[in-house]
Amino acid sequence: MSHPAQLQFVKSVKEKFPDYFIRKNVLEVGSLNINGSIRDFFEQCVYVGVDIGPGRDVDLVARGENLAYHDESFDVVASCECFEHNPEWVATFNNMVRMSSGLVFFSCATLGRAEHGTPRTSPYDAPYCGEYYKNLTEGDVRSACDLSSFKEYAFSIDNQAHDLYFWGIK
């Protein structure tokens, strides 16, 4: 699911690392196009979109934590607006890092964002998600994930959209 602030984040990552957005192998975890996609930011790329259910822009139905591609199979691995819905977000992130040879980035809901995409709230916003929902913080990621494989990385927060953003270069 896309929203304007998250798309602006992806645009900023593309502006910072333009070489990773043309003629690369790209894996997107959580690619179901509900109201927009990051796929359009990539030019002349081999692009694999993965999500837990079928739909527009989903090339493979699978869970991010279970993907078994070889280490460093992709130049870019991304996930936008999914981790807050995934009880296995740590395993998914670690798997994304393992499969990337270069750029990893994600966006997800952080403190202040209302619960969404659950049967309790708006099930059509995330049709394959279950009951789990957790807004994540930079501290959650730092305490649960090993960031040592990145040469450079950064976190940022959009306080209006209540989004947490991360990019890292291996």
Write out the residue ranges for each language-model feature.
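Short N-terminal micro-motifs specific to bacterial/archaeal maturation
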Residues: 1, 17, 58, 80-83, ...
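Class I SAM-dependent methyltransferase Rossmann-like catalytic core
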Residues: 1-20
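Conserved phosphate-coordination/catalytic loops
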Residues: 4-8, 83-87, 135
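N-terminal/domain-start segments enriched in small and hydrophobic, helix-friendly residues
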Residues: 17-26, 126-130
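Conserved SAM-binding loop
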Residues: 24-114, 166-169
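S-adenosyl-L-methionine-dependent methyltransferase catalytic module, highlighting the catalytic core
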Residues: 87-99, 103-170
